[in-house]
Amino acid sequence: VEPELIAWRRHFHEFPELSNREVNTGKYIADFLKTLPNLEVRYPVAKTGVVAVLKGGKPGAVIALRADIDALPVYERVAIPFASKVTTEFNGQKVSVMHACGHDSHTAMLMATAKMLSAMQKEVPGTIVFLFQPAEEGAPENEEGGAQLMIKEGALDNPKVEAVFGIHISSQTPVGNIKYKSGAFMASSDWFTIKVNGKGSHGSQPWGGV
């Protein structure tokens, strides 16, 4: 499956889409998953996301594997054949779009996982739910999206998911290895606002200002 995984990753890298705008990305994923045996595919979920369920041949828990599928408004400065060719409107401006956070890899990795596990369905214990989440970078202003909207639309229900593993690459992990732990594993960011009431001062006495 490695050649396919590389090809998928390069495809997504070349044609990235911003949060809640992953129309072609979601369709590409869903169309592929529908070709696999033993998978129940739901699309669209949370506008552009995809959910696929694999019921294993042995008893066990219901777990979910999740990958994010959106890109960022970033210009790619790398001369590679599959560099991003996409520009779009973002906050009223024309911007370039790039998979600068690895979501192209995460998506390809989860597609490859779905292919392998669906082929060995009889040996899989429990049920696997594959979650391809849009808008991980944050839904546009005044729009719903991301994990909250997927949950709201029942992505973790029917079957009821007992645990979720987020798929993420790491340049510090040797090829052929995986890392996992209970609870949080990698950092994320929170948004907050600081209001500062300034006080002017002379340039020769900056310590007097705020």
Q: What annotation goes with each model-predicted range?
A:
Residues 1-99, 108-125:
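Acidic/His- and Gly-rich active-site-bordering loop/insert found
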Residues 86-98, 104-105, 122-210:
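Histidine/acidic-residue-rich, glycine-tolerant segments that coordinate divalent metal ions
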